[in-house]
Amino acid sequence: MNKLKKEANVFFKKNQTAASLDFKKTLPSIELFSATLNSEESQSLDQLFLSESQNYSDEEFYQEDILAVKLLTGQIKSIQKQHVLLLGEKIYNARKILSKDHFSSTTFSSWIELVFRTKSSAYNALAYYELFINLPNQTLQKEFQSIPYKSAYILAARKGDLKTKVDVIGKVCGMSNSSAIRVLDQFLPSSRNKDVRETIDKSDSEKNRQLSDFLIEILRIMCSGVSLSSYNENLLQQLFELFKQKS
């Protein structure tokens, strides 16, 4: 019986080791995700340490400590980004399985609700992973990884072709979160912003149609040979001056 237990233990340990190695093979290289702090993040840390500067006695050791903490901060960001990608990969694979014919169309969504505290976090990780794997090279993947989380999630989730998203990555790389989001809104506006813009465009179109009707009527009256009053001449003069200012 003891011999059987020993053999079972050896078997399980071997399989556990093999599974661990297989998992490590799927892990992206840590070098790929070594996050460099952007200027804003680095300045924030400098500002934090500035208040501590009066306490140091050795300038050289103090600077070494600051550099070490900055390095650790970058490594923490790398680990966080690895986590998001690994999470996104698992959700991506689960969706492939749950999209098969023998599952209903709502199974994947129900699975998300069952597994995750919020659906948005799952879909954000999925969108993040999908954009990452579709980027054509490691340079772009590194640039995408350097973008602040919120901006990266928004970029991944926004509707738009890959070329546009690649262009946006180049534009926002190194920017702060708020600056990056402003650029995103310009080149990849959200559906809500598009709807508002379309409503404004429709409103302008309707006003222009009405203005065309009024102007045509004014031209018709003036061509009829009517004698304009000084008041109407003044109104027309104001209209011409306003038009010159806008043109």
From Swiss-Prot:
Variant or mutagenesis effect after changing residue 47 to R: In plasmid pCHL1 and plasmid pCTT1
Keyword Metal-binding: no
Keywords associated with the record: Plasmid
Cysteine disulfide links: none
InterPro entries: UPF0137
More details: pGP6-D is required for growth within mammalian cells. The sequence shown is that of plasmid pLGV440.
Family, similarity comment: Belongs to the UPF0137 (pGP6-D) family.
Protein's UniProt name: Virulence plasmid protein pGP6-D
Species whose genome carries this gene: Chlamydia trachomatis
